[in-house]
């Protein structure tokens, strides 16, 4: 078991230095339209017991903040949600919920974790390594190895909880965490069922949007620019980050506007969800292809949920084509990509519950 979080860190300032796009890709470039620099230390918050989520607390669920360490030695911070009046004389199914790229556990993944706890599951929503309240330095980077490992670390943690049946642990990944969850389940058979929502394949988003791989010369040019930036940073220059812009312009594309409406408005904004990611991490996604071996998850089940109108729907369609049975693609009528982050009247809660009830049964 982990411990209650009792750590404080300095707050840092974030400074925008322009809105030009570094990446020329329709998807990842649109979702990360600003270039930013950050001061030396990441922003953290001390846990005081005050509710700090973008959604209301449930009277049917007990919440506490926990910490545990992944295989890479990174301290992960998670919110744990447990149904009230849980029968502790028996063990229960559990779920690990991963947040979207650039998000934090106080947003979408926390909403999913709390809502599934209302439906009888023990759940955790963690901050990915190098993000939110979790450890890892420097902050605001994304490593495929680390974020995949974070899911397995969640299985480690839940499997030691006396209330949890370690043979009945499932995973929900939203947006980029959907791709990470599929990759994690391929190599960790302890994850007995996997559901994704509005899934993104970050390797495809950054380097092969809709299957159209970046031209070799453009790819080489971008890698060279990132290499030069690494030398600059090693010599003391400010780090460069991609993030959503702080304001919209008439030229802002539709995908960026969709993300902006969540991350940059009271709807979903959170002080630790900067959306910023250090550009030096992008080359690590060049060979990240979570669908190539998705059939390895079988005979464990996969449920892929996508909005009918989601710009990301094709990722789920690509994955379902390569997955082996049992598998299901569930399309939410009238929903877009970000709609399934927080619009509780559109999120198919009953579908998620029935899926995990069936496949995490005793």
Residue ranges and their predicted role:
Residues 1-21:
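N-terminal secretory signal peptides
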Residues 49-90:
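N-terminal cap/lid segment of alpha/beta-hydrolase-fold proteins
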Residues 102-114:
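The serine-hydrolase catalytic nucleophile loop
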Residues 117-133:
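Conserved alpha/beta-hydrolase
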Residues 142-161:
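Alpha/beta-hydrolase active-site loop
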Residues 182-262:
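Alpha/beta-hydrolase-fold enzymes
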Residues 304-306:
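Short beta-strand/loop motif that positions the catalytic acidic residue
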Residues 335-345:
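Catalytic histidine-centered segment of alpha/beta-hydrolase-like enzymes
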């Amino acid at each position: 078991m982990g411990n209650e979080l009792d750590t404080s860190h300095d707050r840092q300032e974030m400074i925008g230095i322009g809105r030009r796009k570094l990446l020329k890709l329709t998807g990842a470039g649109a979702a990360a339209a600003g270039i930013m620099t950050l001061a030396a230390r990441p922003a953290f918050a001390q846990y005081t017991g005050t509710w700090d989520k973008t959604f209301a607390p449930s009277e049917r669920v007990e919440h506490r903040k926990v910490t545990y360490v992944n295989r890479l030695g990174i301290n992960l911070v998670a919110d744990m949600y447990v149904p009230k009046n849980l029968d502790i004389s028996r063990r229960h199914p559990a779920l690990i919920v991963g947040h979207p790229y650039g998000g934090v556990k106080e947003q979408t993944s926390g909403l999913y974790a709390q809502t599934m706890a209302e439906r009888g599951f023990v759940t955790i929503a963690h901050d990915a390594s190098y993000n939110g309240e979790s450890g890892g330095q420097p902050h605001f980077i994304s490593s495929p190895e680390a974020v995949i490992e974070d899911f397995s670390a969640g299985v480690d943690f839940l499997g030691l909880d006396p209330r949890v049946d370690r043979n009945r642990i499932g995973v929900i990944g939203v947006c980029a965490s959907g791709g990470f969850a599929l990759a994690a389940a391929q190599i960790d058979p302890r994850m007995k069922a996997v559901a994704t929502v509005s899934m993104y394949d970050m390797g495809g988003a950054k380097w092969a949007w809709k299957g159209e791989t970046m031209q070799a010369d453009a790819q080489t040019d971008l890698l060279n620019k990132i290499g030069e930036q690494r030398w600059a940073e090693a010599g003391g220059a400010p780090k460069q980050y991609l993030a959503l812009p702080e304001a919209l312009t008439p030229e802002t594309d539709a995908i960026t506007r969709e993300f902006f409406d969540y991350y940059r408005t009271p709807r979903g904004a959170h002080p630790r969800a900067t959306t910023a990611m250090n550009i030096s991490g992008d080359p690590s996604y060049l060979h990240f292809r979570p669908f190539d071996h998705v059939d390895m998850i079988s005979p464990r089940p996969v449920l892929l949920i996508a909005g009918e109108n989601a710009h990301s729907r094709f990722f789920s369609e690509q994955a379902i084509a390569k997955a082996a049975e049992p598998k299901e693609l569930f399309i939410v009528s009238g929903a877009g990509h970000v709609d399934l982050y927080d619009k509780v009247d559109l999120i198919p809660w009953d579908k998620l519950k029935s899926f995990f009830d069936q496949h995490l049964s005793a």
